[in-house]
Regions:
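Non-catalytic peripheral regions of patatin-like phospholipases
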Residues: 2-70, 94, 103-107, 130, ...
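Short, basic and Ser/Thr-rich N-terminal targeting/leader segments
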Residues: 83-85
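Active-site glycine-rich loop that binds ribose-phosphate moieties when present
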Residues: 68-77, 109, 113-124, 135-143
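Alpha-helical segment proximal to the catalytic Tyr-Lys
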Residues: 90, 98-102
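Short alpha-helical scaffolding segments that buttress acidic/His motifs in well-ordered protein cores
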Residues: 89, 112-116, 179
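Short acidic-hydrophobic surface loop/beta-edge motif
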Residues: 122-127, 211
Length: 231
């Protein structure tokens, strides 16, 4: 029940932050977090054009991000750091082109901002002198930590982007939306194929399942909601 209340508070805070800016004092924020019905409004179109022609270092030189205040308000980072529930947050190391995972003890506002940093909307988030972007470019979500962590053999996957759409996109914005879905789904598809390959080898008796370095037989489950995610 506490989790439901916290999630409700998060979305209400995001709604308030977006609502304050709907008429233009932060068009990028509105375009990112406002509902789908705004996609055909002049505000949305101007925000899209701005993001395609200017970088966030130009249109947001002071690096303002309303999400920082939202996270500060909603998330109890001290409780998260001390929690027995293992958390893994993925980011993309810009200079190295590699994924970096942050665990409980390392989590902070900056880490969460980095994990959600779309580079055409926000400046890279620096942590310990290194710039980071959204982790979804390389791990969306990262599955491999769960293979080595103290977790059950059942893994439940909740996809955020639809894997399949029934129509061929023809409008420019719809094409870009579908391209982003494919790009962000690609790391997950690659990991799922690797998981399936390893599981096949285990079933064939070709991989060791004993000892600390043994492979585990995992059961993958997914809540598929492509029809809802496509709306």
């Amino acid at each position: 029940e506490g989790a439901r209340k916290a999630l409700d508070k998060l979305w209400r805070e995001i709604n308030l932050s977006g609502g304050r800016n709907i008429f233009g004092d932060s068009s990028i924020w509105s375009a990112t977090f406002s509902p789908a019905w705004m996609k055909d409004t002049p505000l949305w179109r101007s925000a899209e054009s701005l993001a395609m022609t200017m970088s966030p270092y130009q249109f947001n030189p002071f690096n303002l991000n309303p999400l920082r205040r939202v996270l500060d308000t909603v998330v109890d980072f001290e409780a998260v750091r001390q929690s027995d529930i293992q958390l893994f947050v993925a980011t993309t190391a810009v200079k190295k082109g590699r994924v970096r995972l942050f665990e409980n003890a390392e989590l902070s506002v900056d880490v969460l901002l980095a994990s959600a940093c779309l580079p055409h909307l926000f400046q890279a988030v620096e942590i310990e002198g290194e710039p980071y972007w959204d982790g979804g470019y390389l791990a969306n979500p990262p599955l491999w930590p769960l293979f080595y962590a103290s977790t059950p053999d059942d893994i439940l996957l909740l996809p955020l982007n639809p894997f399949q759409r029934d129509e061929t996109p023809r409008d420019a914005d719809v094409i870009m939306d579908r391209l982003n879905e494919i790009v962000f789904n690609a790391p997950l598809v690659a990991e799922l194929r690797a998981v399936a390959f390893v599981q096949d080898l285990i079933e064939a008796g070709r991989l060791n399942q004993t000892g600390d370095d043994g492979y585990r037989k995992l059961r993958m489950h997914a809540i598929e909601a492509d029809s809802h995610l496509s709306d």
